[in-house]
């Protein structure tokens, strides 16, 4: 979709929401998890790899704040960091994800060590962080608008996983429940920023491209997991059965 005449704020929001057709809820890996067709290893692999994304989110949000000169925006945006890191003695989303890891049979060290993070996942997530560091703060902030589609994916896990995977402990689902309300709040703020900033056809086209970039990141993460856990073709599988890839955060 190429915008030639500046869309109204409502029409621009509709164009952003239409990108939901490419959200990773439609990826075969996620469909398999939703339908109960994923193996224990595939669930564990997803949880371990997605943790790298979760721990990068506060770094991304801090980069946005560092580039943002507007105090009012920073005061609102900082809540996203607190949601993940925790505040006032309360645990945040990262701790909740560690509990999800334990609920699916992984140790905290399995996640914190990052030894299970596939190179393709790491590259995709690092690209997102580097974009947030280098882009203008408005564009970086609006790259988070995949949150438009997040409540649906969190609810789908709450609806289907307990039924299909009774071996997952109940306490593991807290993260998904907490994000239902948090994501809706974040969407409201993000949409307001996008509609205020994108006041020309050029900016609207670029923002749609940025949103597609973020969708590409989420989809590529699942492509990497598909190769490793569904097709049994992890990196270097033709030369070794060991995990030979790098396991440290280099950027």
UniProtKB/Swiss-Prot annotation:
Disulfide bonds: none
Keyword Oxidoreductase: yes
Keywords: Oxidoreductase, PQQ biosynthesis
Superkingdom classification of source: Bacteria
Pathway this chain belongs to: Cofactor biosynthesis; pyrroloquinoline quinone biosynthesis
Reactions accelerated catalytically: 6-(2-amino-2-carboxyethyl)-7,8-dioxo-1,2,3,4,7,8-hexahydroquinoline-2,4-dicarboxylate + 3 O2 = pyrroloquinoline quinone + 2 H2O2 + 2 H2O + H(+)
One Pfam family here: TENA_THI-4
E.C. number: 1.3.3.11
GO molecular function: pyrroloquinoline-quinone synthase activity
Single biological process term from Gene Ontology: pyrroloquinoline quinone biosynthetic process
Keyword Ribosomal protein on entry: no
Enzyme class: oxidoreductase
Role according to the record: Ring cyclization and eight-electron oxidation of 3a-(2-amino-2-carboxyethyl)-4,5-dioxo-4,5,6,7,8,9-hexahydroquinoline-7,9-dicarboxylic-acid to PQQ.
Database matches in PANTHER family: 4-AMINOBENZOATE SYNTHASE, PQQC-LIKE PROTEIN
Family note: Belongs to the PqqC family.
Subunit structure: Homodimer.
The protein's name in its UniProt record: Pyrroloquinoline-quinone synthase
